[in-house]
Amino acid sequence: MYRRSGRSLVACAIVVALAVPLARVAAQESFYKGKTIRLIVGLAPGGGFDIYSRVIARHMGKHIAGNPILVVDNMPGAASLLAANFNYKAAKPDGLTIGNFVGGLVFQQMLGLPGVEFDGLKFEYLGVPAQDNFMIGVAKSTGITSIEQWKASGTLIKIGGVAPGGGTDDIPKILKATLGLPLQMVSGYKGTGPVRLAFNAGEVQGVCNSLESFKATWRSEMERGEVNILVQANLKPHPDVPHVPWAPDLAKSDDAK
């Protein structure tokens, strides 16, 4: 969660709020009372970013002096780069606009990639909704139930993605290069919500998504057994899926790991 430098928000933690001088709290209450905060989401409705943002919007105003209303505004495009650029260039730095976009965009700025029009050092960072634990899941209809079977069969699976710079695209590409996975990226969807629709329509047969988003927004597909999670690509194996192999354990060389 990000916003431009400007009037600061009271932290949600009660202990922090109590430490704020009363005069400052009164000033913030006067400013935010009756106001609306715009929460810009860089991806389409129906995905994990959207769900997190709507839950935050429902509760966050109760923890800000003055109890402003939070309104979610989806602004998908280029793996949330459009929203990040808007937050930096167009949104007024007055404490009434917050952005929720892919954190990996900061690395795009560091690498000097085209399209980045913001300076990540000039955002004020409020926090993150969750630590994403990325997994690749494929359709049951492919007949693929394990990473070993997938590699041995050579079955080309189309993976739905959003755009370079996000985990939906970058992680499958890395796993293709390091593990030799036979996959083809089909990028350009506005978020994992539209990817899920494409998955159900048979346009793509797989997705790289966070485990948290799989549980929240792909619940029906998971409960019906329509998705087989084959590999996890996290900093460490996730305890909720001990049966799913961890990508570094599958790598055959130190460079791949």
PLM region descriptions:
Residues D94-F101, Q205-L211, I229-V231:
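Paired acidic/hydrophobic, glycine-rich loop segments that form the ligand-binding mouth/hinge
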Residues R58-L70:
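Signal peptide-proximal N-terminal region
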Residues L39-S53, P76-A79, G160-G167:
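Extracytoplasmic "Venus flytrap"
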Residues A11-P21:
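Bacterial N-terminal signal peptides
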Residues K62, F86-T97, L105-A201, D249-K257:
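Hinge/capping helix and adjacent helix->loop/strand transition within the periplasmic-binding protein
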Residues Y2-C12:
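Bacterial N-terminal signal peptides that target proteins for export
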Residues V25-L39, A65-P68, A91-T97, I144, ...:
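Immediate post-signal peptide segment of exported/extracytoplasmic ligand-binding proteins
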